[in-house]
Amino acid sequence: MADEFLVVGQVVAAQGLKGEVRILPASDFPQRFTEPGSRWLRRRGHNEQQVQLLSGRQLPGKELFVVRFEGINDRTAAESLVHQEFLVAADDIPELEDGEFHVRDLQGLSVRLDTESDPIGVVVDLHHGGNDLLEIELKADGRRCLVPFVDAIVPQVELEEGWLLITPPKGLLDG
């Protein structure tokens, strides 16, 4: 059941000879890759397979984690996991600080230029990086644009009401 799980990363390569794999994270919560416990792997078009995470560490200077799973003890076994999605249970939601949001809470929010106006678009995704970027689909022409998710440009997020306010600099939304 797809809605029972959250995709938090992807296995991108085997690491060494002892069965470790590299995971590219799609989550801001490193404990999902370092704390032992149940996780799931899923190859596209297949069902989830439960695995036990034994250990994990972040590669210094990289946005990659190296993890070890129970029963994966050599490079051949590790290579068989490449391209699989790394999942956690959907109810495994870490506590957030004020001003932090889960991607799934932002997706679908209406985007407004002021608190009284009609929406100009909808949030379709959040891209992580040096600064997170909201991907917004504009109502006027269906175009998608990226908006820096920083207080100066997105000063207000109203999850309960289903919208957020943006104050884009001139040209940011232009085609």
Swiss-Prot record:
The lineage of its organism: Bacteria, Bacillati, Cyanobacteriota, Cyanophyceae, Synechococcales. GO terms for biological process: ribosomal small subunit biogenesis; rRNA processing. One of its GO terms (cellular component) is cytoplasm. One of its GO terms (molecular function) is ribosome binding. This is Ribosome maturation factor RimM. Signal peptide: none annotated. An accessory protein needed during the final step in the assembly of 30S ribosomal subunit, possibly for assembly of the head region. Essential for efficient processing of 16S rRNA. May be needed both before and after RbfA during the maturation of 16S rRNA. It has affinity for free ribosomal 30S subunits but not for 70S ribosomes. The PRC barrel domain binds ribosomal protein uS19. Keywords: Chaperone, Cytoplasm, Ribosome biogenesis, rRNA processing. It is found in: Cytoplasm. It holds the Pfam family PRC_RimM. Residues 98-172 form the PRC barrel domain. Binds ribosomal protein uS19. It comes from the Bacteria. The keyword rRNA processing applies. Belongs to the RimM family. It comes from Synechococcus sp. (strain RCC307).
